[in-house]
Amino acid sequence: MQGFRNHTVLQLELTQPRLLVIGPNGIGKSNLLEAVELLGSLRSHRCSNDRDLIQWDTPQALIRADVGDGDRLELELRRQGGRQARRNGKLLDRQLDLIGPLRCIGFSALDLDLVRGEPALRRQWLDRVVLQLEPVYADLMARLNRLLRQRSQLWRQRQISSGERHALLEAFDVQMALVSTRIHRRRQRALHRLEPIAQRWQTHLSGGTETLELHYKPGSRLDGEDAEEPWRLAIEEQLRQQREEEERLGSCRVGPHRDEIALLLGGSPARRFGSAGQQRSLVLGLKLAELELVTQLCGEPPLLLLDDVLAELDPTRQQLLLEAVGESHQCLVSATHLEGFGGGWQQQAQILGARELRPDLKIG
């Protein structure tokens, strides 16, 4: 890794299935895990602008890793000219072709806002689940975001005639309906698969006192069974019906960007009625369910990134999380100290301290 965040140069060889990154806040622990997440999914849960990921005095940042059976993945972030992705030294025409060999699931303190935060946080969480199961999903999301930008720009272009705008919107509606349908179906399918596993974890975490329901509420009216053609036609019609409202507000009123994922405990919205402890248990259960589902469907466990999350959990939940990870998952864990990690965990871990993490700093 070169020029990424506050890391000038960092080279690591993982010799154990567990890497414990220990050090004070601000030393770059989260940045290391973020780099791994970015290489595996092309996304960062902390930042949406690549320029913020590049060290301030360098023109580019580089992340490279050897994974699996010798696959070399490389992602270069440039201030000018965007990104370049390489696999085994070959420049890829599409960055998306980098997704797949490095499946990873992240769990950080930021995820604790999943229950009480805005709907966008739950959409982003579900999108990360779908992406692990179907890497092609990244292309669908890129197309959706591009279409939304184009529609928004179209409403601001006052110089074109109403006839031209109508023709362009008709074309956009067809594309938007197709992409939206495919995203809706994948999100719904993933949540349906995830729900029974999450319910089992919630029962375990609550001592059998709480029931969990996950409801997918699409930002389009979708009646009947999961079927692409009826849903596509329904979304096209809704887009036409909402045009006046869309023009007035300047934003598209129909589509996956308006989805909500409802989390219910005992039949009541956990966001409104769940205690802080219940919400944390729910997030933990969702993450453990995600880990189990991806392992089950992909045939091998993903890399687990635990970013300073243990400090946010009580000792009981800490222990449950560490036990659930077990010996079958490779994981990178950041923390300010080793407390909470049992002797067995430390014995099977490679421990990276502040000196190794930031060799460019003089640490007394």
Curated annotation (Swiss-Prot):
BP GO annotations: DNA replication; DNA synthesis involved in DNA repair; double-strand break repair; SOS response
Keyword annotations: ATP-binding, Cytoplasm, DNA damage, DNA repair, DNA replication, DNA-binding, Nucleotide-binding, SOS response
Superkingdom, taxonomy of origin: Bacteria
Main subcellular localisation: cytoplasm
PROSITE patterns membership: RECF_1, RECF_2
UniProt cross-references to SUPFAM superfamilies, sorted A to Z: P-loop containing nucleoside triphosphate hydrolases
GO cellular component: cytoplasm
InterPro entries: DNA-binding_RecF, DNA-binding_RecF_CS, P-loop_NTPase, RecF/RecN/SMC_N, RecF_2
Binding residues annotated for ATP, in chain numbering: 23-30
Keyword DNA repair: yes
Single Gene Ontology MF annotation: single-stranded DNA binding
Similarity field: Belongs to the RecF family.
Function comment: The RecF protein is involved in DNA metabolism; it is required for DNA replication and normal SOS inducibility. RecF binds preferentially to single-stranded, linear DNA. It also seems to bind ATP.
Name of the protein described by the UniProt record: DNA replication and repair protein RecF
Organism taxonomic ancestry: Bacteria, Bacillati, Cyanobacteriota, Cyanophyceae, Synechococcales
Gene name as annotated: recF
